[in-house]
Amino acid sequence: MAEKHDLLDDIIDITNNWGAVSKPVETVMNGISFDPETAPQWDPSKYKERPRPNSVRCLSVASKDPKACTKCQDVCPVNAISITETALTVNESCRKCGLCAAVCPTEAFLIQKLMPKTLYNSIAKQAASHDHVYITCTRALGRIPKENEIVLPCVGALSKELWFSLFMEYDNISVYLPLGVCDRCRTTTGEEAYTDAISYAEELTGAACGLEVDEKALDHEYSRAYKRSQFLGQVARTGTSLVAGHNAAIKGAQAVAQRIQNHTQRVNELTRSLEQAVGVQNSQHHRRMLTQRRELVMAALQKWPEPAKQMKSELPTCDMSKCTMCGDCTEACVLHAIELDRDGKIQIEPAYCVGCGVCARVCKEGALEMHPTDGSALVVPDPHAEEIERERAEVRKLKQQGKKVLDSSLKALGDTFGEDSSSKK
C-alpha cells in the first residue's frame, strides 16, 4: 500500500527543485557548456575481471583428485578452468563472467569486484536508500549505470547465499534484463545459474525477486524514509527555513552508512563468538575458515533463524571402527572443518563445513559417510540479544516485585484506615 503523501513530502519536493528555480542562468549555462568528449564513457570492461585462482583453497587440489569437485568447470561456459593434482588455473579464454566464483564452495577464486561482502554492502546501500535496486549485467544495460543499478559481468555472479542474505533484509530488489538478452549471450550457463540461485533464496525466505524488462519502467527515486531523514537532518543542523535553497543534507546517507556498518559489526562479532566457542585453531593447529558467503548467511540467521530448519545440506559422520587415523580427510578439507583430535577421534564443526563431501570421497576405508542435515548449526546466538533479554526479564521481575510491595502497602494502608474509622465510631 502506498504511503500517504503529507505536508513534509510537499516541502521536500519544493526544496529539491528550488536550486533550479533560484539559479536559472547557472542551470542553463551548465546545459550549454556540457562537453560530451569529457563526459564519462560507458566501458563494460570496467565491471569485468579475470578470477585469480587460489590452489590452496581448491578441494580437488587438496585431495589430489581433479574430479573431487568440478563445480567451477561445470558452470564455465568456455571451459577455461583446468584442475590438476597440483594447481587450479584459468586460461586466456576466460569470459570474466564470475560464475566460477559464485559456485565454488570454498571461494577458491578471487575477484576483487565480486567479493561477497563487498557486493552485499553495495547492494544493501542502494536498497536502503532507494525505492528499488536493480541487479543487471553489462550486456543488458549498455550505458553508465544510475546510482541504484548494480552492474555485474553476469547476474549469475551473485551466489545463492548472497541472494538469501539480501532477501532476508530487503524486499525491494529486482533483476533488470530485457527480453532475449540472455538468449543471445555467449555466457550460455549464466541464465540457469542465476535462476537457480534466486529460486533457492526465494524458497527459503518467502521473498519474491522483481523482474524488469523495460528500461523506461526503471525507478531511480530515493525512498520516502531516506528523503525525509535527509531533509530533517538538514533543517536540524543548519537551522534554515524549510524552503531554503541549500544542498541536500547527508543525514539520510549517514543513516544508510550506519546500517551497513552495523551489519558489518554483526558479522565480525558473530565470527568472534564462533571462534570463542570452538577455538580459532583445530587440534592440528590449522585455522578454521569461514567463507564470506557463510558469514553473511549466519549473520542473517542470527537475526531471523526461522529458515535454518528448511535449509538442506549434508554433514559427514565417522564410523570410528573403520577409521585408521590416516588423516587424508583432514588434508582434503581446506576450511579445516574436520579434525583428528588428541584422542584419535574425528570431529566436525558444522558451522565451518560446507557439505562438499570431499572428505568422504578420499576416505579409503569408507569410514566417513555424508548424511542429510538442516541449517540449525548455523544459528549462533547473539550474546547482545541474550544480554538485552536478561535485562528485560530483570526489569519485568522488578516490576512484579514492586507491584506486590505496592499492593501490600495499599492493603495495609486500607486496613489502617478501616481500624481508625472503627475506633472513632
What are these regions (language model features)?
Residues 87-106, 226-235:
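Basic (Lys/Arg-enriched) interaction patch that binds polyanionic ligands
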Residues 297-299:
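C-terminal compact regulatory domains
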Residues 72, 76, 100, 104, ...:
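A structural signal for short beta-strand/turn segments enriched in small hydrophobics and glycine
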